[in-house]
Amino acid sequence: MIEWIIRRSVANRFLVMMGALFLSIWGTWTIINTPVDALPDLSDVQVIIKTSYPGQAPQIVENQVTYPLTTTMLSVPGAKTVRGFSQFGDSYVYVIFEDGTDLYWARSRVLEYLNQVQGKLPAGVSSEIGPDATGVGWIFEYALVDRSGKHDLSELRSLQDWFLKFELKTIPNVAEVASVGGVVKQYQIQVNPVKLSQYGISLPEVKQALESSNQEAGGSSVEIAEAEYMVRASGYLQSIDDFNNIVLKTGENGVPVYLRDVARVQTGPEMRRGIAELNGQGEVAGGVVILRSGKNARDVITAVRDKLETLKASLPEGVEIVTTYDRSQLIDRAIDNLSSKLLEEFFVVAIVCALFLWHVRSALVAIISLPLGLCIAFIVMHFQGLNANIMSLGGIAIAVGAMVDAAIVMIENAHKRLEEWDHRHPGEQIDNVTRWKVITDASVEVGPALFISLLIITLSFIPIFTLEGQEGRLFGPLAFTKTYSMAGAAALAIIVIPILMGFWIRGKIPAETSNPLNRVLIKAYHPLLLRVLHWPKTTLLVAALSIFTVVWPLSQVGGEFLPKINEGDLLYMPSTLPGVSPAEAAALLQTTDKLIKSVPEVASVFGKTGKAETATDSAPLEMVETTIQLKPEDQWRPGMTIDKIIDELDRTVRLPGLANLWVPPIRNRIDMLSTGIKSPIGIKVSGTVLSDIDATAQSIEAVAKTVPGVVSVLAERLEGGRYIDIDINREKASRYGMTVGDVQLFVSSAIGGAMVGETVEGVARYPINIRYPQDYRNSPQALKQMPILTPMKQQITLGDVADINVVSGPTMLKTENARPASWIYVDARGRDMVSVVNDIKTAISEKVKLRPGTSVAFSGQFELLEHANKKLKLMVPMTVMIIFILLYLAFRRVDEALLILMSLPFALVGGIWFLYWQGFHMSVATGTGFIALAGVAAEFGVVMLMYLRHAIEAHPELSRKETFTPEGLDEALYHGAVLRVRPKAMTVAVIIAGLLPILWGTGAGSEVMSRIAAPMIGGMITAPLLSLFIIPAAYKLIWLRRHKKSVS
């Protein structure tokens, strides 16, 4: 089949070259128009349900809202995890779906089940699903800063809510624009209970008057003088005077009682659950642009920047928009870095080919296969919908060296056959027809084996394709693009390369020995191979023993899910104890921001504590998220690295009650979405009794702090909140004609504040709140004395119908699959993640006694690593079996297929030692490198075995298979190995040359790519030894055993 393809391609070379030209043009177009991003979209398919229950404590929100929702959503088809978050006034339910679920199908199913549960929710409470985006979609953040001092925080927030937000939402593929920080203007009506009693007016009557005084009505239309006039009755409240003039009742003497007679009306801030601060200089308002799932981040960010630039002219005097986070900077750095690495690889590979072949036109044949293979890869990426990012370009980058292997072997074989023709026809000039025939025959000779070897390299990545979840989404693009590149190289090797050789390999072909580099290689290899063939069993024994040398480096190499990716920005997410007030949270935020900004490498600090106004952010008030933009590296102090900056920040920001955590923004949001844990290592304690969960979590926190390498650990306090419990006495309430519901309505309105509508001021809408003044609700004793006017117009106090006590309780409740849980955040440095987790597990088993009904599970990146390892342990053996079948189909002998397969562990020795020398940990990235190395090593073995078989078949004594001498066998093996050392040395050289720029790279994404390249580079030390020495020695023993009766 392969022979037929090669011969038909040569016969129709004009059509083939036209097709190659078309591919190059089409591929160039796709390269230019392929969407770009920093990382693949790693987010799970999720649907967020947000339910507001204003003024309600977390326990009430959990019991009445979150619990019904989570238990119902567990039945949604395809849902794998349901997480619930109950906090003050809000419920968030995250429904995480299985891989491959269509997002919009998932949203429709969640809506279907949401309709079913709506009747179980409290009256007046309705749920809504969040935008078709995730927390990973936070691609652009900005702050509104007043440089003039003329605009307060409420004006800045109004500017964001009613102007910028709407303008930015018009940009295609912006899912949502979330407001953060500032203060929301609110009309506050502080009712004096004493005056209410004097006038005999109850609080519900005031609410009713407010609601009826803030309406508009239509009166249809009237016809006047042949014209139609539409009738409207305007009644919206638009000023404080409008509020003051609301009539509550009319006295017996006809004198009206106005709202101003019983209440004070003012504007003030709505209760704050999110605060923003910039550079330690004070609070600001801001916004977050959230990308729709699966869309082009850089295009959207460009459109956002352009829109903001046009809106600057419309801003009030002195107001400035300051960019505080821009993901396109990372995208550009990552793409530029890998693009330059690809160009470096192309250049280095070209030099290697020219040096070995000593023939420029022949080198061009090999080199031209690289851009053509790149075009093929991008064309397939275009149809698959893959964007260009660190991982997809990285797949092409690690394939560059192997892509030219087939071309190198074919060119070298053509050189060899043309050289042989010259020896057989001394003094003759080869004609064009004969030259095409020789080149075609040379291609046919090695084509099938090369195609099989490239197919093995391609299939070796099957385990990567089977990865699921976050690791599958991360390494899937790399596996796809590497496969496309290798598949393109395989197709080019049997279709285009023979034709290019026919066109360009002309004139006098330099003999192999005329190249000084080749002479050195042959001279060095010749005596070593003779000794190996003289002592084949000793050679194999030494090789087998060398495999055991990896035991020690393996024991020293730690484990991790992925290396930390330097995104160019940082996210500061300290863990704080619960129960902090908004004022204290704002002060703490400004203090930490000011300390962070004092580090010279920091460009800007945008701090946020609490949540932004979006369903994608469920952060409680005590949760700090500070975005740190770093200056370009050329502006850093000499010798500074990202790790040194983090260490300095950690030393600088040392405040009581804070457990510091410094993480990359995208990486952190991905982890929080996938596992819910914001730190690299997380521990989830689940149970049924909150006090037991809390006690267990705090015990684990104490023992985890003693583990070497742990720099911070903090367990969430489920019982850390402070509650004022109002326990209504039903009997006492009934004596005053009040029900429990009446008292609860009074508590929620007078103390918590009741929302009684909103004002309409152009496009702006501002809430109206009614409650008692602060003096009546600033202590438990004041609450007891709070006046109540009963339905029978009796004056009593709250203490007459209820007992008031101060107790502790949860500030936030978390559940996973409807089971309450407490999360413990662990940050470790100086040790690998797997070792730290194993030590924590040991400490927990020895020192922590679990309460009945509680369970402990490790999460975070460790959970992802375990999931990936479990899948690889299943798929790697299956892939090895597939490779064995391919080898058998190639050689039609079990012993020869086993020879290549059994020798692969030796090729991995160099990779393991090199990994240890570089100080890298075992991870999914290094595992990917080892899988790629195994495929390349198998290719080396196939090519060497092919040369040895050809040499034996061409030997006059061995080809008869009657009798032969061991010397004759050694001579044939010598010709197959030594006289073909050039192509083997070239393949090693081009692979190493292609990988070194990746290993030495320092730009965005280099952390992952260097881990993939390291095992392959180390393996290029032992894999050639496998091909050059072990395969010939083992093949000699196999041949002798197979023909032992013919030995003379």
Swiss-Prot record:
Keywords: Antiport, Cell inner membrane, Cell membrane, Membrane, Plasmid, Transmembrane, Transmembrane helix, Transport. It comes from the Bacteria. The chain crosses the membrane at residues 14-34, 125-145, 338-358, 363-383, 391-411, 446-466, 485-505, 539-559, 737-757, 871-891, 897-917, 928-948, 985-1005, 1012-1032. It is found in: Cell inner membrane. InterPro entries: AcrB_DN_DC_subdom (IPR027463), Acrflvin-R (IPR001036), CusA-like (IPR004763). It holds the Pfam family ACR_tran. It is a multi-pass membrane protein. The keyword Ion transport does not apply. The keyword Membrane applies. GO terms for cellular component: plasma membrane. One of its GO terms (molecular function) is antiporter activity. Component of the sil cation-efflux system that confers resistance to silver. May be part of a three-component cation/proton antiporter. Belongs to the resistance-nodulation-cell division (RND) (TC 2.A.6) family. This is Putative cation efflux system protein SilA. It comes from Salmonella typhimurium.
